[in-house]
Amino acid sequence: MEAALFIFSLIDCCALIFLSVYFIITLSDLECDYINARSCCSKLNKWVVPELVGHTVVSVLMLVSLHWFIFILNLPVAAWNIYRFIMVPSGNLGVFDPTEIHNRGQLKSHMKEAMIKLGFHLLCFFIYLYSMILALIND
């Protein structure tokens, strides 16, 4: 059972890694003016909720299965994702708003956030991989 949990977490983490890379590529395309702000934000806003759900599901599964270290490791990023989603101003189209993305350095902050998430998900990938191997050996 524990091995299945870590296999699912590993697959989910791979999806979140690819999603972080997609965010970085799309934001860098906007930064270089290869795409306009409206198409960039519409592409990115489609993936905010799946990212939120994917990360929250893994965090809850770690809590339920009593893997405290991994849960506490995932908790700040999951809380940040939920906070960011809830605190979208009422006039904005989503977390990524085409009218606001070039103001006050938001593009750079979104890019920095995507890079940090990529590093975090890579760290989690190796933790899940190690835990999966350990669970398979112990079974």
From Swiss-Prot:
Tell where it localizes: Membrane; Endoplasmic reticulum; Endoplasmic reticulum-Golgi intermediate compartment
The reply on keyword Endoplasmic reticulum is: yes
According to its record, how does it sit in the membrane?
Multi-pass membrane protein
Note the Pfam families from the entry. Answer: Cornichon (PF03311)
The record lists the membrane-crossing segments as 5-25, 60-80, 118-138
Keywords noted in UniProt: Endoplasmic reticulum, ER-Golgi transport, Membrane, Protein transport, Transmembrane, Transmembrane helix, Transport
Q: Cite the InterPro entries for this sequence.
A: Cornichon (IPR003377)
Q: What is its main location?
A: membrane
**Cellular component per GO?**
endoplasmic reticulum; endoplasmic reticulum-Golgi intermediate compartment; membrane
GO BP? endoplasmic reticulum to Golgi vesicle-mediated transport; protein transport
Reported function: Involved in G protein-coupled receptors (GPCRs) trafficking from the endoplasmic reticulum to the cell surface; it promotes the exit of GPCRs from the early secretory pathway, likely through interaction with the COPII machinery.
The entry sums up its family as follows: Belongs to the cornichon family.
Q: Any idea what this protein is called? A: Protein cornichon homolog 4
